[in-house]
Amino acid sequence: MARTSFTVTELNAHIKQLLDADALLGNVCVTGELSNYKVYPSGHHYFTLKYAESSLRCVMFRSSAQSLRFRPASGMSVAAIGRIAVYPRDGAYQLYCTCLLYTSDAAD
């Protein structure tokens, strides 16, 4: 069986292409508890969504965060809507959040 050799950069780029091509991951709603919620001077919001023993890193850019109707904080239950993509530098996938809602405001 032949093996394909990749540099780390090539492999991360390939995985990014695969995730970007997946329509399901292009528009998802993920529910969980906010953790490590931080707003940076750039206006970008970074947080982790947790559910049971799982976690998902998330980012909400300033342009999307401007439409928030509440002040998010760690410990809140929310629904995050956005797309899953790879951050190639770190080789890690995350949710690029475009909308964040209290779980009670989200559709089941």
Model feature map: region roles:
Residues A2-L101:
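Phosphate-interaction motifs
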Residues Y102-D108:
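Conserved small/polar residues in nucleotide/adenosyl-binding loops
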